[in-house]
Structure formats: C-alpha cells, structure tokens
From Swiss-Prot:
Entry keywords, A to Z: Acetylation, Heme, Iron, Metal-binding, Oxygen transport, Phosphoprotein, Transport
Binding site for heme b: H88
Residue ranges annotated for the Globin domain, each copy included: 2-142
Record's GO cellular component terms: blood microparticle; haptoglobin-hemoglobin complex; hemoglobin complex
CDD domains found in the cross-reference section: Hb-alpha-like
Family, per entry: Belongs to the globin family.
Gene name of the encoded protein: HBA
Protein name according to UniProt: Hemoglobin subunit alpha
UniProt-listed Pfam families: Globin
Length: 142
C-alpha cells in the first residue's frame, strides 16, 4: 500500500503528538487486544497479562519503538522492519491476522487519547500506515 504525501504528513504529525506516551499507548493497545481477542494471549504464555503488568508495558514499549522506527522510514519499511519480520515469521510464528487486530486496537487507543487530532483523514492515514507495517511484518511468511 502506497502512502501519499498527505498520509505521511498525517502519520508524522500524529506520532509527534504521541511524544513520550508511546510505550504507555502501546501497552494499552496490547491490553485491549488481549481483552477483546483472547486468542492472541497464546503467544504470551510466559507473561503476566494482568492490568498494569510490567511485561505488557515492556512489550508495549517494543511495539511503540518499532512503530517509531517505521514512522522514520516510511519510504523503506521493508528494510527498516526486516529483522522484525524475520522474528515474527520464523521464530515467534505469530498468526499474521494478529497484526490487523493489534492495528485496530492501536487506532482505538490513539482515538481515545488524541480525539482532537483523530480526524477522518488522520484515521485513514494511520490505518493505511499500520496496514503497510503489517504487510511488511508478514512478508517473510511466504
């Protein structure tokens, strides 16, 4: 999926507003995913998945850091996320459908925390961006 200049601008502007809340929002999105899509818990059998879990917060930071990297490399997501794609496809063997679920939960989380910024245009741009990231993360499954 090709991101237009407007999409890229919307994503960068929104990500800048997230500021130092990335880890917090990442953890909140994961917690939301675990509550609403319980099958996703199977990939974290060693985690305490309770509210305010340090392990979920730590993984939320990893998610946020990966997305921050992706925001900085929107023109070359394939190279920027190649290692993560390998990890999820070959070592962790995450069901590719879970990326869409997490993307949805991230969008909900961002809409809740940034209601003024979450216009229909920004929503569409973030959705396209997260779909592009998901496509890259599942590219090594084939």
């Amino acid at each position: 999926m090709v991101l237009s200049p407007t999409d890229k601008s919307n994503v960068k502007a929104t990500w800048a507003k997230i500021g130092n809340h990335g880890a917090e929002y990442g953890a909140e999105a994961l917690e939301r995913m675990f509550m609403n899509f319980p099958s996703t818990k199977t990939y974290f059998p060693h985690f305490d998945l309770g509210h305010d879990s340090a392990q979920v917060k730590g993984h939320g930071k990893k998610v946020a850091d990966a997305l921050t990297k992706a925001v900085g490399h929107m023109d070359n997501l394939l190279d920027a996320l190649s290692d993560l794609s390998d990890l999820h496809a070959h070592k962790l063997r995450v069901d590719p459908a879970n990326f869409k679920l997490l993307s949805h939960c991230l969008l909900v989380t961002l809409a809740l925390h940034l209601p003024a910024e979450f216009t229909p245009s920004v929503h569409a741009s973030l959705d396209k961006f997260l779909a592009s990231v998901s496509t890259v993360l599942t590219s090594k499954y084939r």
